[in-house]
């Protein structure tokens, strides 16, 4: 009896203890989760993030939290918190979840170092911390006790230092992804000791040294990613040919040299080989044809030579062949047309010659076809779009002849048609002008002929280029149906008739070139309604009538060419208000009257802009040739005696006019010093007449909507930059101008171009600046010298320009908003120190007395913040956006507009590029966009500036940093090894 009672007591005690243990453990996990929520959310997290994670007295409440899975004992065994997003850090309390088997906290914004308490999670099978901002060295020691770990994913973080070696001892580890970080040094030899590894990702780091041949010992490995931004020495290890289970080998963009090892042909299970963007040489080994499973082969952007091996006809599974930008030669083998699964063939920029295989595309699978810049001849294969799925058809810069195949006009899947610079002839299939998805149709520089179809449509077409062909007939009125069209080029053809007014009703149209045709009739009045226009060229036609009234509505127009027509009437006075117009050509027409003066007319060279108009009078000239000519013509009807008298009077008058002119010129020179007044903001040993004498055509160093800039060499040996302002200013009598310019003259900062003074008379204002002998940043980035501007210099210029803007926004009195930040307004002195220029002028250049208006000038195309479109206001965050565009220019080396397709600016292009990456990360994106002219740059530094740039160009102004914050970020880059081991050599 006593034994039974004792047994019951022990049983009750055990049950109570177990129940207490469950309760304690349950509440312990609840407390840990609540601590995690508090730490991981961060200040920037949205209110609803993890909102269901709340305290409760229920033992199982935490098991119903989003992303939480419990076992039968109410212990947390899985935590999956993905894409919340979170902005805090991972706290030490994570170690309390000791039964955790799966920790997945990917795609958030968690920062700081990983806590050492992770070492307590000895039951972990999956640790996924990818797509966060964790930093510091990866603490490999935390994995020592994780003997069950099968997958470790730390992709796309900010870990630095050497690769962790402790993880090699994890016998069950199958998946290791450390790509997209800042790991440096060499790949440890010990990485060949993994026993079960199937996936190894070390790409997109800063690794150097040789790729260890010993990695070939990883016999279970199926995927090996080693490329992208790593900078190895040597080439592909031949021993890799023994990795019999390998399915994917990626070693792209990692500075590989040497030849492709023939031993890779032994990888019979390999389906993808990516070795593009390296320095590989030699020919393609025929042995690669033994890779019977191969589907994707990318050898692009190397220095490979020779021909495509005939043995590649065995590769029946090939879907992708990227061979572009090499030195391959010979013909494209006929077997390529027989590959049953081929979808992508891109071989542009090689030396391929002869004809294309006639059956190319006959497999019914083609998606992408690009053979640009080769020496290919013959006819275009007729079945390229047999699949009905072809997206790109690009054969530019070859020697193709014959017609465009009818099938291209029926290929509704196409997005790009580019056949320029060939010898194509015959009419264009009408369907080409009705494809719904095409964004660019480029047929220029061929011998295409016939009339354009009367039915034209295409809801996606943004660029239509038919230049330099033999097209005839009228321009179809249906052209107006192209509602997405931004650029229209019909120049150098044989079009006749009038320009359809509907052309200028296309809502997004920015560029029109219809020059060099046989067009007649007037310029359509609808042109004045298309405010989006930036360039119009109607020259070399037979257009007549007057220039339509209302041209001043085209405030974004920068180029207008109406030369070599029969246009008559006066030169429109309203052109003076077209402040963006920097190129105007009205030469060789029948304009009459007097050329207007002032405003934007000060930008133009009269002798070139208005040449060849015999009845046009120029201002400030002694006589008007047309008037004198008409007078003489009428006198011919009179008697010889009267004619002689008139001629005598005319000659006497001419002599008198010459004498008067000489007298006036001498008088003007005598009184020039009295007509101009110099106001100096520091001691200047120059006179007003010294400045005025420099206003000569040969001294012009720049033109823009704000005025003309001259280089002035003063008698004392100093050089100054003289800016002649264009606008409605009233010279020295404009007291608003004087007050504001004198305020600007007091600004002193080493990174702001100093205003030395100004010279004015009653009509004109001349601003005097320090002369910057090295020109503008824009000239260095986008001119011939761009490749010589190394990364260190670019970063230095960014810091200095940021400091100048920061001073204007935060420390200047009064505070100044620049309103036209761009690379051309960042000037470089003799020591290449950056100086911000043209600050604060926009608010009074065009509207004297309205200097409080913040919307009189929005900036320059490509730099304008998006909010201007609906607020018509600018503030300091608008400057920040523009500066972000400048930072992108420094990184990418391309202009903000004009190089990414019509209607796409540099910000939109970067975002589009990011969306197209298969594995998006800062590293991958930077490598995809970085200026190819740069060599040997520290990747960490480029990524750091790129991240700052993307913060600056955020769509909403309040989300952008201040310039003070920008300076702080630029001057405090992340700590990294900046030795040559951290350099990427492209």
From Swiss-Prot:
Official protein name in the record: Leucine-rich repeat receptor-like kinase protein HAR1
Keywords assigned: ATP-binding, Cell membrane, Differentiation, Glycoprotein, Growth regulation, Kinase, Leucine-rich repeat, Membrane, Nucleotide-binding, Receptor, Repeat, Serine/threonine-protein kinase, Signal, Transferase, Transmembrane, Transmembrane helix
Record's keyword annotation contains Flavoprotein: no
EC number(s) recorded for this UniProt protein: 2.7.11.1
Binding site for ATP: 701-709, 723
Lineage, opening ranks: Eukaryota, Viridiplantae, Streptophyta, Embryophyta, Tracheophyta
Pfam families from the UniProt entry: LRR_1 (PF00560), LRR_8 (PF13855), LRRNT_2 (PF08263), Pkinase (PF00069)
Residue positions the entry lists as glycosylated: 80, 102, 109, 128, 141, 255, 266, 279, 317, 351, 513, 518, 561, 590
Catalytic activity field: L-seryl-[protein] + ATP = O-phospho-L-seryl-[protein] + ADP + H(+); L-threonyl-[protein] + ATP = O-phospho-L-threonyl-[protein] + ADP + H(+)
Domain Protein kinase as annotated: residue spans: 695-971
Mapped LRR repeat ranges: 71-97, 98-121, 123-145, 146-170, 171-196, 198-218, 243-267, 268-291, 293-314, 316-339, 340-363, 365-387, 388-411, 412-435, 437-458, 459-482, 483-506, 508-530, 531-554, 555-578, 579-603
Gene inactivation effect: Increased number of root nodules when inoculated with Mesorhizobium loti. Inhibition of shoot and root growth. Increase in arbuscular mycorrhizal (AM) fungus colonization intensity in roots (enhanced mycorrhizal phenotype) when inoculated with AM fungi.
Any one biological process term the GO annotation gives: cell differentiation
Mode of membrane association: Single-pass type I membrane protein
GO function terms (MF aspect): ATP binding; protein serine kinase activity; protein serine/threonine kinase activity; receptor serine/threonine kinase binding
Function per UniProt: LRR receptor kinase involved in the regulation of root and shoot growth, and root nodule organogenesis. Involved in long distance nodulation signaling events. Involved in the autoregulation of nodulation (AON), a long distance systemic signaling from root to shoot and back again, which allows legumes to limit the number of root nodules formed based on available nitrogen and previous rhizobial colonization. Acts from shoot to root to control AON. Involved in the regulation of root colonization by arbuscular mycorrhizal (AM) fungi.
């Amino acid at each position: 009896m006593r034994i039974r009672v004792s047994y019951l007591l022990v049983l009750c005690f055990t049950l109570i203890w177990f129940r207490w243990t469950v309760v304690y453990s349950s509440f312990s996990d609840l407390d840990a989760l609540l601590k995690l929520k508090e730490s991981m959310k961060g200040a920037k997290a949205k209110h609803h993030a993890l909102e269901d994670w709340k305290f409760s007295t229920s033992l199982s409440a935490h098991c119903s939290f989003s992303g939480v899975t419990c076992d039968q004992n109410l212990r947390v065994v899985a935590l999956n918190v993905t894409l919340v997003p979170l902005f805090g850090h991972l706290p030490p309390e994570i170690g309390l979840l000791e039964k955790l088997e799966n920790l997945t906290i990917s795609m958030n914004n968690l920062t700081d170092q990983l806590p050492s308490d992770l070492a307590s999670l000895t039951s972990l099978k999956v640790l996924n911390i990818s797509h966060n901002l964790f930093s510091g060295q990866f603490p490999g020691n935390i994995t020592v006790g994780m003997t069950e770990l099968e997958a470790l994913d730390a992709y796309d973080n900010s870990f630095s230092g050497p690769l962790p070696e402790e993880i090699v001892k994890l016998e069950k580890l199958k998946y290791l992804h450390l790509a997209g970080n800042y790991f440096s040094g060499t790949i440890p030899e010990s990485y060949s000791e993994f026993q079960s590894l199937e996936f190894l990702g070390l790409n997109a780091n800063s690794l150097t040294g040789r790729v260890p041949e010993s990695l070939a010992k990883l016999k279970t490995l199926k995927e090996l990613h080693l490329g992208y931004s790593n900078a190895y020495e040597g080439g592909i290890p031949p021993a890799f040919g023994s990795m019999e289970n390998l399915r994917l080998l990626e070693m792209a963009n990692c500075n590989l040299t040497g030849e492709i090892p023939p031993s890779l042909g032994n990888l019979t299970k390999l389906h993808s080989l990516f070795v593009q963007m390296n320095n590989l040489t030699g020919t393609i080994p025929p042995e690669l044809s033994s890779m019977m499973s191969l589907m994707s082969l990318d050898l692009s952007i190397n220095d490979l030579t020779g021909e495509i091996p005939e043995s590649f006809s065995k590769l029946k599974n090939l879907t992708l062949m990227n061979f572009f930008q090499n030195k391959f030669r010979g013909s494209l083998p006929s077997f390529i047309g027989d590959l049953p699964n081929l979808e992508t063939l891109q071989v542009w920029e090689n030396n391929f010659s002869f004809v294309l295989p006639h059956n190319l595309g006959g497999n019914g699978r083609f998606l992408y076809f690009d053979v640009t810049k080769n020496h290919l001849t013959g006819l275009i294969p007729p079945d390229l779009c047999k699949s009905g799925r072809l997206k790109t058809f690009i054969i530019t810069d070859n020697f193709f002849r014959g017609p465009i195949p009818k099938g291209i006009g029926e290929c509704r899947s196409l997005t790009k048609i580019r056949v320029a610079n060939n010898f194509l002839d015959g009419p264009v299939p009408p369907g080409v002008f009705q494809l719904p998805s095409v964004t660019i149709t480029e047929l220029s520089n061929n011998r295409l002929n016939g009339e354009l179809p009367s039915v034209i449509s295409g809801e996606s077409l943004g660029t239509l280029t038919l230049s330099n062909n033999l097209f005839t007939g009228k321009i179809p009125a249906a052209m107006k149906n192209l509602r997405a069209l931004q650029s229209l080029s019909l120049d150098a053809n044989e079009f006749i008739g009038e320009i359809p007014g509907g052309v200028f009703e296309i809502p997004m149209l920015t560029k029109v070139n219809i020059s060099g045709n046989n067009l007649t009739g007037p310029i359509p009045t609808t042109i004045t309604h298309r405010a989006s226009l930036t360039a119009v060229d109607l020259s070399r036609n037979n257009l007549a009538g007057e220039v339509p009234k209302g041209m001043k509505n085209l405030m974004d127009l920068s180029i207008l060419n109406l030369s070599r027509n029969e246009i008559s009437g006066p030169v429109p006075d309203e052109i003076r208000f077209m402040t963006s117009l920097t190129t105007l050509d009205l030469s060789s027409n029948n304009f009459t009257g007097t050329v207007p003066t002032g405003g934007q007319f000060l930008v133009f060279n009269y002798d070139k802009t208005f040449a060849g108009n015999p009845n046009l009078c120029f201002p400030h000239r002694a006589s008007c040739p047309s008037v004198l000519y008409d007078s003489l013509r009428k006198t011919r009807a009179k008697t010889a005696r009267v004619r002689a008298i008139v001629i005598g009077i005319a000659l006497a008058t001419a002599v008198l006019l010459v004498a008067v002119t000489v007298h006036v010129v001498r008088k003007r020179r005598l009184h020039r010093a009295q007509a101009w007044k110099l106001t100096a903001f520091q001691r200047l040993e120059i006179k007003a007449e010294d400045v005025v004498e420099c206003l000569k055509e040969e001294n012009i160093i720049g033109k823009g909507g704000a005025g003309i800039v001259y280089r002035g060499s003063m008698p004392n040996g100093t050089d100054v930059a003289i800016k002649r302002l264009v606008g409605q200013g009233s010279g020295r009598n404009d007291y608003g101008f004087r007050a504001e310019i004198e305020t600007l003259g007091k600004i002193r900062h080493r990174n702001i171009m100093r205003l030395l003074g100004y010279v004015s008379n009653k009509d004109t204002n001349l601003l005097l600046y320090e002369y910057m002998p090295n020109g503008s940043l824009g000239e260095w980035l986008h001119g011939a010298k761009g490749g010589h501007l190394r990364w260190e210099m670019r970063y230095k210029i960014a810091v200095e320009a940021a400091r100048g803007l920061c001073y204007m926004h935060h420390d200047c009195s009064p505070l100044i908003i620049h309103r036209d930040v761009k690379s051309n307004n960042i000037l470089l002195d003799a020591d290449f120190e950056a100086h911000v220029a043209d600050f604060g002028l926009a608010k009074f250049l065009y509207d004297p007395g309205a200097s409080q208006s913040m919307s009189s000038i929005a900036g320059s195309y490509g730099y304008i913040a998006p909010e201007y479109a609906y607020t018509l206001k600018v503030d300091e965050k608008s400057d920040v956006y523009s500066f972000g565009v400048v930072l992108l220019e420094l990184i990418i080396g391309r202009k903000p507009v004009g190089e990414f397709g019509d209607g796409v600016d540099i910000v939109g292009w970067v975002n589009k590029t990011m969306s197209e990456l298969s594995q998006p990360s800062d590293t991958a994106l930077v490598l995809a966009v970085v200026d190819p002219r740069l060599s040997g740059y520290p990747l960490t530094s480029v990524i750091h500036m790129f991240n700052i740039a993307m913060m600056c160009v955020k769509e909403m102004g309040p989300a952008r940093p201040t310039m003070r914050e920008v300076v702080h970020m630029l001057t405090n880059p992340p700590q990294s090894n900046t030795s040559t081991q951290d350099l990427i050599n492209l």
